[in-house]
Regions:
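C-terminal "capping" alpha-helix adjacent to the active site of nucleotide-linked donor transferases
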Residues: 283-304
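A charged, aromatic-enriched C-terminal amphipathic alpha-helix characteristic of glycosyltransferases
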Residues: 35, 74-79, 299-336
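Nucleotide-activated donor-binding/catalytic signature segment of Leloir-type glycosyltransferases, i.e.
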Residues: 199, 208-227
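Donor nucleotide-sugar binding/catalytic pocket of nucleotide-sugar-dependent glycosyltransferases
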Residues: 116-160, 164-168, 222
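Short acidic/histidine- and often glycine-rich active-site loop of Leloir-type glycosyltransferases
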Residues: 268-279, 283-286
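Conserved donor-binding/catalytic core segment of Leloir-type glycosyltransferases
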Residues: 144-198
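Short hydrophobic beta-strand element within catalytic cores of glycosyltransferases
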Residues: 259, 263-266, 276
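Acidic donor-binding loop of glycosyltransferase active sites
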Residues: 235-249, 262
């Protein structure tokens, strides 16, 4: 099968720094190539895959994602649309797999080529909903209709894991109110347990007026800034802490923790109850008190169960097979 995979335009694939969705797209392209498919990745400069890569204009670097998030012109994908139109005028593919935010080509030319559209967020009114694929069951239910879902997958054959944990729990996320690092810090203070907080500062006001003062009050909590990759950070951490205060559809870092044999302590928001098996691979919590209790009980979770669950449910090969099935349905003319 000849597959055009269209990535996002605001970061390279694989990403530089923060970029969960770009890591997912890269894992998918590599697995598809290994399974014998011809893959063409359309993505910004510095992107690459084991198949063929077609570079397209990146989003304006002078207006980074964090600066425009929430604006009406969040991402101008017209240059991506023009690049896709020019490419498809001269080359044929069997199916388009579109991970972009606006899906402009398939919206404007729905009969041109069979397509599948993946989303990592709850799409707004202007987003494409035909042949839409969510990241999990809860995400699909939120979108409604006939939306399908495919779980993200990781290259587990290359993913290091460690059963013996020697480092404190770690909270990994960009520093923003909806990621609620302050709840993790308060839980650490209540449990009197150490904590590492990692992530780039997206919301300066939240960091300066909420997170930083708590760090002053909690000497056992260490902020280390943005990390280049999650594997080393998660390898020996006794737990991953996640405290989303929004519908976090299917956070990739949770799968990365499980692949590292690292238990997860998380608020039961969005897709997290689908990812974490309470009492088996971690604990699902509802407030600071239950987060603190879970931090005190993390030794009850067997890291081997975390790794086994990742292997059973979240491999890149399983993700690729599930998507190939949807590609075949789209090729057969099915619409959902």
């Amino acid at each position: 099968m000849r597959i055009l995979v269209v990535s996002t335009v605001y970061n390279s694939t694989p990403p530089v720094g923060y970029g969960g969705i770009q890591r997912v797209v890269h894992s998918l392209t590599e697995a598809l190539v290994r399974q014998g498919h011809e893959v063409i990745l359309m993505a910004p400069p510095r992107s690459s895959c084991s198949g063929r890569t077609v570079h397209v204009p990146a989003y304006d670097p002078e207006r980074p994602w964090s600066a425009v998030k929430g604006e009406g012109d969040l991402l101008s994908e017209e240059p991506l649309y023009e690049a896709m139109r020019e490419f498809l005028d001269s080359e044929r593919v069997d199916v388009i797999h579109d991970w972009s935010f606006q899906s402009l080509f398939v919206r404007r030319h729905p009969q041109h080529t069979p397509f599948v559209v993946s989303t990592c967020i709850p799409p707004g009114p202007g987003f494409e909903r035909t042949n839409l694929v969510a990241s999990g069951e809860a995400h699909a239910r939120l979108i409604g209709g006939t939306t399908r879902h495919v779980h993200y997958g990781l290259p587990l054959r290359d993913w290091k894991f460690e059963i013996r944990k020697s480092e404190p729990p770690i909270h990994i996320a960009k520093i923003a109110r909806f990621k609620a690092q302050h709840l993790a810090i308060l839980a650490s203070m209540r449990a009197r347990r150490p904590l590492v907080v990692a992530g780039n500062v997206e919301n300066e006001r939240y960091f300066n007026f909420v997170v930083r003062p708590l760090l002053w009050l909690a000497p056992q909590v260490r902020y280390i800034g943005e990390i280049a990759g999650t594997q080393e950070a998660l390898l020996r951490a006794s737990a991953l802490i996640q405290t989303p205060r929004w519908f976090d559809c299917f956070p990739l870092v949770v799968l990365e923790a499980l692949a590292s044999a690292t238990p997860v302590i998380a608020l039961a928001e969005g897709g997290l109850p689908e990812q974490v098996k309470h009492g088996v691979t971690g604990f699902l919590c509802h407030d600071v008190a239950s987060l603190a209790e879970a931090m005190s009980r993390i030794g009850e979770i067997d890291p081997r169960a975390c790794r086994a669950d990742a292997q059973a449910r979240f491999s890149d090969e399983a993700m690729a097979r599930a998507y190939v099935e949807l590609y075949q349905r789209a090729l057969a003319g099915e619409r959902w």
